[in-house]
Amino acid sequence: MDYSKYKSSGRYYTGAERKKGILIQGEPYIVKYAKNSPQGLTCSYLSEYIGSHLFRIAGIEAQETFLGKCDGLPVVVMKDFIGGDEIFVPFNDVGDSTLEQSRERYKYTYEDIMLMLEENMKLTNVEETVRHFWDMYLIDAW
């Protein structure tokens, strides 16, 4: 499927890969492009697609993903999971606001991650978030 034909949603995203927001039948979707590297395009978009499907097979709620092309490049597309009254906070930003360390020189331990999750004032259900973190970690490691 060619996603180039869809209009912009006006939403913008950060992260390692180039992304853009589009509207499909009035609903916002995220387009994630394959990342360029010195060896050529990476397969991170395929990893996102396969990973999401593995999570769903394991019974863990995950985004629905679709493969296609946009602007002539391979992409993975997913429904935007951010509600109208929500904001997305990347994990590194959570850590930056919680730990007194520079993320460029600091590697998080599991204890650091648990501390961040337990003490973060932005989370509304810490216990569920911690359980979900470990579910995701185990499936991701598998």
Predicted regions, residues:
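Short strand-loop-helix active-site module centered on a catalytic nucleophile
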Residues: F55, A141-W142
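Conserved ATP-binding subdomain of kinase catalytic cores across diverse folds
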Residues: M1-R103
